[in-house]
Amino acid sequence: MYSLEIIPGKLSLKQLREVSRHPTKLSLDPNALPDMLISADVVAQVIEEGKTVYGINTGFGLLANTRIAEKDLETLQRSIVLSHAAGIGEFMDDATVRLMMVLKINSLARGYSGIRPLVIDALIQLVNSEVYPCIPKKGSVGASGDLAPLAHMSTVLLGEGEARYRGEVITGKTALEIAGLTPITLAPKEGLALLNGTQASTAFALEGLFAAEDLYASATVCGAMSVEAALGSRKPFDPRIHRVRGHRSQMDAALAYRHLLAQSSDIGLSHQCCERVQDPYSLRCQPQVMGACLQQIRNSADILEIEANSVSDNPLVFADDGDIISGGNFHAEPVAMAADNLALAISEIGSLSERRMALLIDSGLSKLPPFLVDNGGVNSGFMIAQVTAAALASENKTLAHPASIDSLPTSANQEDHVSMATFAGRRLGDMAENTRGILAVELLAAAQGLDFRAPNKSSNRIEKAKELLRERVDFYDKDRYFAPDIAKANSLLKEAVYNHLMPDTLLPSI
């Protein structure tokens, strides 16, 4: 189990990657307590003084001008949670819910939400007990925050809704009992504070970021293997080429290929005097394409790290000034655009991989046996595996369409522009799965090509990468049932086994 002390506003991407991967034991920095208490006191003072403040003693959305009587304030907070729990579809994975809850705890604990520490402590206890609310994946437009997903999370605090514990769906009441909790009666503003925020969108986008980083590392390894298998040149990775263009990420991408390929190898020396002048773009322009993808990954990482530590509630309590101010931090446009950029990177990583794989099976370009198998005609080799890769690459082109440019008014036109950040982040999982499948096919093909170059060998790192695959998948001496081999290669990549072959500091959370 991963242990994490939350210092509000200070979560790192590396910590969040661990939260997304492992059950987590949370604790909260005790220095956060005073700010939370003061913030909650400001809300209590509003009630005591009889002021009218949105979200505390008013309705919500288009009903914001409706004043709520003091006797109904507890009912108001309970009602907003139950009425907004209107999601649909399959439940989020436990890992996504855990990440979302950690983000919510981090935001609330900063002391701008007017919520009592006991509510935050209850969320922490649920995470520590590995009790995860059942949250439908669909139903949020990413403004006013992720209302439906966060409402489903919050129903469990009331002893309502459903949760999952050790793979079993249980009632909210049972979930609280397992976590050693009793149902909470929410104080004024607490229901709205729980529901307003970008944490579902950000959790999906962070998962997409972590997947994109893993894919980037895998694709760089596969690309370097393909260079060797196709008797490609190392010259396109010369640092001087990339230095004069000036893009930092392109320079770093080229460095990663040099790191893998080393100065030379038996295979490299075997074609020193060949007649080929230039390699096809899918080999030669890898630093340029992958460098651009790396830049999008890094840009998105910066945005998502800020958002992960942000306060996206509304209204916000500024206790030092005694002010409660309504704004729009719940609007997840930054998250949506970051996710859209990740979608571009994930799609292009897969698209370039498919082209390299297509090159390998083309004997005219690669100087390898047609479709990477002997006795062609009797054997079809990798012929249809490339078709599968092409299908996945084309599917990703559709999924990469920007979600952030879409908007549909909600709440009787009070919420008349929305971000669609939740979908923007959620579809990244499907895209990553597609790209991983493409890379799995290339990995199989590149390893096959390298074996055809025997007895010549590649660099130590490339040989190690091939060895990891060969522990699970044998060389193709003739046609056999292909799908299980793709599945094994896919599983290897899903384990992110090639991340450690990357230079340090290349990828933000690794």
Curated annotation (Swiss-Prot):
Keywords: Cytoplasm, Histidine metabolism, Lyase. It is found in: Cytoplasm. There is a cross-link at residues 143-145 (5-imidazolinone (Ala-Gly)). Pfam families: Lyase_aromatic. It comes from the Bacteria. Pathway: Amino-acid degradation; L-histidine degradation into L-glutamate; N-formimidoyl-L-glutamate from L-histidine: step 1/3. SUPFAM superfamilies: L-aspartase-like (SSF48557). GO terms for molecular function: histidine ammonia-lyase activity. This is Histidine ammonia-lyase. It comes from Aliivibrio fischeri (strain ATCC 700601 / ES114) (Vibrio fischeri).
